[in-house]
């Protein structure tokens, strides 16, 4: 990937569910090493926007670019993509590691098997190489000692760390986190945020939908505040948290900080 080229671009993204307009033409650019946090009230469109970036939700309009691959979205009356190469979308998805709030691990596989699955069967990489790298990523997230366990034997925080290792194993250009701590007991939140902070320090490109304001303030290079499907405020953490210009953003922050 060209070092001068943005890692991820979402431009003028619109999304409707029936007659309800969820996203009203919002844009984001993440350059290499950026950590972009998306904050806002529940129902503001944060997760929908994130899911549109890798086509888990199909935008009704917009442009998504990952490295040198891009899709300019056109849809029919039913909201289905038209004139788009599905293989291009698959190539884009492989460059975006996704971490969900609900872990989404395969319950019938061990921790190690979960992390190896994508590189083995999607990337078709050699098993020995995949296993070694999977153990390295499990070690990175502090859970290599649980490689033979099954997800049901782990705490929520441990399961989420496995899902982060699984995303890393695909060696993506960027990581997308959809409220990665919201399903966790409060005492387990810290262990997951510690891993994500470590990834930020390594220079990984990340887009994080989060309710953890301290994390967004301390780790982000850029913060977006969404309100009713629009970007109401954006800037550096200092600009957004210390000197927001939007009354709605000020009200939101005063209620959560």
Swiss-Prot record:
Gene Ontology MF terms in the entry: ABC-type amino acid transporter activity; ATP binding; ATP hydrolysis activity
SUPFAM superfamilies: P-loop containing nucleoside triphosphate hydrolases
Topology with respect to the bilayer: Peripheral membrane protein
Residue sites binding ATP per the record: 40-47
GO cellular-component term (any): plasma membrane
TM annotation in the entry: none
Keywords annotated in UniProt: ATP-binding, Cell inner membrane, Cell membrane, Membrane, Nucleotide-binding, Plasmid, Transport
ABC transporter domain: residues covered: 8-253
Organism listed in the record: Agrobacterium fabrum (strain C58 / ATCC 33970)
Subcellular location: Cell inner membrane
UniProt main location, coarse: membrane
Keyword Membrane among record annotations: yes
Name of the molecule in the record: Nopaline permease ATP-binding protein P
General function of this protein: Component of the nopaline active transport system probably consisting of four subunits: Q, M, P and T. This system is also capable of transporting octopine provided that catabolic functions are induced with nopaline.
UniProt record similarity statement: Belongs to the ABC transporter superfamily.
